[in-house]
């Protein structure tokens, strides 16, 4: 078991140790890992304050000077308050800035609907050049950070709070964690952890489980080869039904004329 945010910060710290031209901007957002990062890199770790648009503007300027930039913010605020800056500054110019979102979905539900983040995947998937990740264990956190650092352009990484199970066979894009017979569950991020707690029941019912880390660009062919083995698949996550990644999968199934039935939950 590992804390997902601690894992993300651990690999950001390792990346910043290796890449001296990297910076970390916090939008008045803290965590245990952030405190460690501040002590290690006091000159490269900046708290911008509650100013999402300014943070993206500053990150863009740093990226234009060939810096690698991480921006840490609450999910619901970063994409709603700074959408224009993300779209025009980061995406249109394909700048190397990684947005680390804290509290996607209903993670901060006790704080009320202002903190719900139920359409972030839909928003970021629609942006050009943007890579989207939803890691679910230590290995996929490492893969997400590494993939961003070693490629061009912006990225968005969802990070939920809490401890998560580890999966030895996790890969960057699509992982067939558990093989089933007729029915398949497809999910990502936090929900992989929920179903991991019910592995014995899934095995008993012969229900397969696919975990997705990299949502965009998506490995269509890999999932298609898995879907061909199942009669029914169920996509489950914490998005609005009309803003779900499941809509993309539905379109994919119909475009490829697969016989697999899909239901979005």
Predicted segment positions?
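Thiamine diphosphate
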Residues: 1-163, ...
